[in-house]
Swiss-Prot record:
Enzyme Commission no: 3.5.4.16
Entry coiled-coil feature ranges: none
Any one annotated GO CC term: cytoplasm
Gene Ontology molecular function: GTP binding; GTP cyclohydrolase I activity; zinc ion binding
Cleavable signal peptide: none
NCBIfam families xrefs: folE, PRK09347.1-2, PRK09347.1-3
Metabolic or biological pathway, per its Swiss-Prot or TrEMBL entry: Cofactor biosynthesis; 7,8-dihydroneopterin triphosphate biosynthesis; 7,8-dihydroneopterin triphosphate from GTP: step 1/1
Name of the protein in its database record: GTP cyclohydrolase 1
HAMAP family recorded: FolE
Keywords linked to the UniProt accession: GTP-binding, Hydrolase, Metal-binding, Nucleotide-binding, One-carbon metabolism, Zinc
Protein encoded by which gene: folE
Assembly, per entry: Toroid-shaped homodecamer, composed of two pentamers of five dimers.
UniProt cross-references to InterPro entries, sorted A to Z: GTP-CH-I_C/QueF, GTP-CH-I_N, GTP_CycHdrlase_I, GTP_CycHdrlase_I_CS, GTP_CycHdrlase_I_dom
Residue positions binding Zn(2+): 85, 88, 156
């Protein structure tokens, strides 16, 4: 999980003013008791939800990159995440499952989860987030292969538009050894196990 330090940003005051204006434009009284601190709360929330822009996922992996001869699949599954859809700025959330096959180097397991957190803490589309996670691991560790599967519920589909509350979107991307159907199948079987 990303650290929960207090958000201090030069953008905070501007964001507060813009959110105050939005509340007024929606027809509400931004000065009434229940809404007085809402612009600041929302501004801080948005800065937290997008703090991935200020973090380097490659550096996170490099900070715990270890030489190791292990050459079988490493899977970190059921990584919970929240993100914001870049089209409506509504949340989407779910689980990421990430595997790689080392090629002389491994990384700390928590670093895989941190990479997911960094890319999910940006305005995103699920497809690009899946690709970014895969590319970051491939570029930094140079493994024999990487596979990422992301399953998510999108509030932009549940609260508005088609209003399909039970829909789940699944995306996947892979490189190297995962181009082989047998390797992909092994990964899929392993992430389905509970």
């Amino acid at each position: 999980m990303l650290e929960k330090e207090e958000i201090i940003s030069p953008a905070l005051e501007d964001l507060k003013n813009h959110y105050r204006s939005i509340i007024t434009l929606l027809g509400e009284d931004a000065e009434r008791e229940g809404l007085l601190k809402t612009p600041e709360r929302v501004a801080k929330a948005m800065l937290t939800l997008t703090k991935g822009y200020h973090m380097d996922p490659h550096e996170v992996l490099r900070s715990a990159k270890f030489q190791e001869e292990y050459s079988q699949m490493v899977i970190v599954k059921d990584i919970d995440f929240f993100s914001l859809c870049e089209h409506h700025m509504l949340p989407f959330y779910g689980k990421a499952h990430v595997a790689y096959i080392p090629n002389g180097y491994i990384t700390g397991l928590s670093k895989i989860a941190r990479v997911v957190d960094i890319f999910s803490h940006r305005l995103q589309v699920q497809e690009r987030m899946t690709l970014q996670i895969k590319e970051c691991i491939q570029e930094t560790l140079n493994p024999l292969g990487v596979m990422v599967v992301v399953e998510a519920k999108h509030m932009c589909m549940q609260m508005r538009g088609v209003e399909k509350q039970n829909s789940v979107t699944t995306t996947s991307d892979f490189t190297g050894a995962f181009n082989q159907a047998k390797t992909r199948e092994e990964f899929m079987n392993l992430i389905r196990q509970r």
